[in-house]
UniProtKB/Swiss-Prot annotation:
GO molecular function: nicotinate-nucleotide-dimethylbenzimidazole phosphoribosyltransferase activity
Keyword Transferase on entry: yes
Reactions catalysed according to its record: 5,6-dimethylbenzimidazole + nicotinate beta-D-ribonucleotide = alpha-ribazole 5'-phosphate + nicotinate + H(+)
Highest taxon listed in the record's lineage: Bacteria
EC top class, as a word: transferase
Protein name as it appears in the record: Nicotinate-nucleotide--dimethylbenzimidazole phosphoribosyltransferase
Record-annotated active site: 320
Length: 353
């Protein structure tokens, strides 16, 4: 379904030379230099010649952050501090402009889109994209969360949305999520893919008690035992323990990479979706930039297993794409120095190593 081209290494020598000849010691801008390298490679995929590349200016265009919302049947078993009704209430808050992600997007220059992937109370707002796969997933410790047909429909929905955003000029896409109970799904995905004990994968989400943590661990262990025959295949894994929003995020990552877009990965839930996407097509990882390490237990280990270094560590545990949103100034700074910082020759400065 997704044909993703590996990043072109043809111009690596030109990128490295340009970075290394800026008026600074080698490597002095640290991780920003690596981000500049990755972004330039992603955004220059259509360039064919050295001459064309030399004239090319890599820029972030119409950065868009999409919040995918979905309800989880497992929430009824008390694995979260909030009831499922809060998902729809927060979608209404996104539409009204009152959530943290609204403020961050307004301040930092993101276009914000909200997608109903399947919540108990359908949003009446015309601003919300209707990609519903149902009202709510089935409890993952009792049944398959959804069918494989629903997973494939979610991928199709995500692909259509990404194509629409691409046509609007977007070349940098971030994802956020809203779904009461979705850290339980993400923990199950993490445990299945990394073959880790559930206790290392389950965290407090938005702040549950010790009693709820124990219940959450038990639920995930039950789910993994019930669905052990489905854990190796990524599509079957999503059907077994995923969420409607996690399915769409996974599909959107794959679709965005297929379109040559930079993909900014948010926190624990989005990183779980990224692991599934990588399992489906490992090349997608070349397009992923991990924005932050959240305060959710397991996220740091997840990032370590993926061998990626996040840009920020702010102890966030909100979701919504807030960490991804906050990374945009760093991405812009990386391209800013790459495009505009003087070289030693331009500035008449003696080159230092």
């Amino acid at each position: 379904m997704f044909k993703i081209a590996p990043l072109n290494n043809q111009f690596d020598h030109l990128i490295h030379n340009k970075i290394n000849n800026k008026t600074k010691p080698l490597g002095a801008l640290g991780q920003l230099e690596l981000i500049a390298l990755q972004l330039v490679k992603i955004l220059s995929q259509t360039i064919k010649s050295d001459v064309e590349f030399t004239a090319f200016k890599a820029e972030i265009c119409n950065p868009t952050l999409v919040v995918f919302a979905g309800d989880h049947g497992i929430a009824a078993q008390g694995v979260s501090i909030a009831p499922s009704e809060v998902t729809a209430q927060m979608v209404a808050n996104f539409v009204a402009g009152g959530a943290a992600i609204n403020i961050f997007c307004q301040q930092l220059g993101w276009q914000l889109e909200v997608v109903d992937c399947g919540i108990l109370e359908k949003s009446p707002a015309s601003k919300v994209h209707d990609c519903r796969l149902g009202n709510i997933t089935a409890p993952l410790n009792l049944h398959m969360a959804m069918s494989t047909a629903q997973v494939k429909q979610g991928f199709s929905n995500a692909k259509s949305l990404v194509l629409q955003l691409k046509q609007q000029g977007c070349n940098t896409l971030a994802m956020g999520e809203m779904g009461i109970g979705n850290t339980t799904s993400a923990a199950a995905i993490m445990a299945a893919i990394l073959n880790l004990p559930v206790t290392q994968c389950v965290g407090r989400g938005t702040g549950v008690s010790d009693e709820l943590i124990a219940r959450k661990i038990n639920v995930v262990e039950q789910a993994l035992q019930l669905h052990k025959a489905h854990l190796a295949d990524p599509i079957a894994l999503l059907a077994a323990v995923g969420g409607f929003e996690i399915v769409h995020i996974t599909g959107a990552m794959l679709a965005a990479a297929e379109q040559g877009m930079a993909v900014i990965v948010d926190g624990f839930i989005c990183s779980a979706a990224a692991m599934v996407a990588i399992k489906i097509n490992p090349i997608v990882k070349e397009y992923l930039i991990f924005a932050h390490c959240s305060n959710e237990q397991g996220h740091q280990q997840m990032l370590s297993k993926l061998e990626v270094k996040p840009l920020l560590q702010l102890d966030l545990r909100l979701g919504e794409g807030t960490g991804a949103a906050l990374s945009l100034p760093l991405l812009q700074a990386a391209l800013g120095f790459y495009n505009h910082m003087a070289s030693f020759a331009d500035a008449g400065v003696e080159q230092v190593v």
